[in-house]
Amino acid sequence: MTIKIAIDCMGGDHGVSVTVPAAISFLASHDDAAVVLVGLPDAIQAQLKKLRAQDHPRVSVVPATEVITMDDPVEVALRKKKDSSMRVAVTQVKEGLAGACISAGNTGALMAVSRYVLKTLEGIERPAIATTIPNEQGWGTTVLDLGANADCEPEHLLQFARMAEAMVAVVDHKEHPTVGLLNIGEEVIKGNEVVKRAGELLRASELNFHGNVEGNDIFKGTTDIVVCDGFVGNVALKSTEGLAKMIGGMIKEEFTRSWFTKLLAGIAMPVLSRLAKRLDPARYNGASLLGLRGLVIKSHGSADAHSFEWAIKRGYDAAKNGVIERIARAFADKTSAAGAAPASPETAPTPHPSTRAA
């Protein structure tokens, strides 16, 4: 069974110098995968030649004549750059030529292009951005939305929870994962009207709802999933990234302050190495755009090759485990349970040809 991954090679701060090496490294550890490199052919081929991978049997190149920059507004991405590497890569997923698309490009453009090309699954009003944040338990907490929807209705938060539950169940192999609603306190009376109403909907749902959680619960691993609107989620994510960077810098500064602290650093190196591995941001790179009729993974724009490879792995795992099919099935089941007409074939899509037995 071959899993094909389409890669927007031109996206992000570093383009082909990161995306192509990451793709080749990924293939070295995944014999059942293939990559479709999308972008300016000359730039891609030059990188493949450097890596002596120009004849790799599991690499194909699909040309695109345009590049969406990190500063391009959504209107430009959608209306003017119709042959961008980002759009062509997403189209590979739509046409069943790839099981997932990975891009480090402009987040707003990627969401807009993906929603325009792939459309949302039946029963889902808004896609959401989800990622995993490290916690004390060691497996990470899935948090969404991280910026796609600054303003949400209570029903949207319920939908986000259902999408995340479906993803975590198949990717992390956790049936009935716990769900928490991010709030300013655990009490049901806390929060604004949207959050309080969302709590009521979650408590009445079939989900394994833990209740309200606070920001520190994300890192405790109190629940497997934490749901919030995109405004709160984005602030939480950026604050987490900033804090981690600050603490890392402070530790480095203290351990290099004198010859004695450098000696202590050498003694503590095994412990520091294990800690660095647990908190390695590269392992958590790759946010999933949930709710679409195809898999799209957003890598951090400044990712290096090691970090981008983890984003590819995230897309590979999601495609291999049938995340889209699981989400579609969850919403189709809810529609049927509510007495609606049976789901159409579009509601529960069959696996992409790229994920079937080769």
Curated annotation (Swiss-Prot):
GO terms for cellular component: cytoplasm. SUPFAM superfamilies: Isocitrate/Isopropylmalate dehydrogenase-like. Its main location: cytoplasm. InterPro entries: FA_synthesis, Phospholipid_synth_PlsX-like. It holds the Pfam family FA_synthesis. Keywords: Cytoplasm, Lipid biosynthesis, Lipid metabolism, Phospholipid biosynthesis, Phospholipid metabolism, Transferase. Its EC number is 2.3.1.274. Residues 336-358 are annotated as: Disordered. It is an enzyme of class 2 (transferase). It is found in: Cytoplasm. It catalyses: a fatty acyl-[ACP] + phosphate = an acyl phosphate + holo-[ACP]. GO terms for biological process: fatty acid biosynthetic process; phospholipid biosynthetic process. GO terms for molecular function: phosphate:acyl-[acyl carrier protein] acyltransferase activity. Pathway: Lipid metabolism; phospholipid metabolism. Belongs to the PlsX family. Catalyzes the reversible formation of acyl-phosphate (acyl-PO(4)) from acyl-[acyl-carrier-protein] (acyl-ACP). This enzyme utilizes acyl-ACP as fatty acyl donor, but not acyl-CoA. Homodimer. Probably interacts with PlsY. This is Phosphate acyltransferase. It comes from Cupriavidus pinatubonensis (strain JMP 134 / LMG 1197) (Cupriavidus necator (strain JMP 134)).
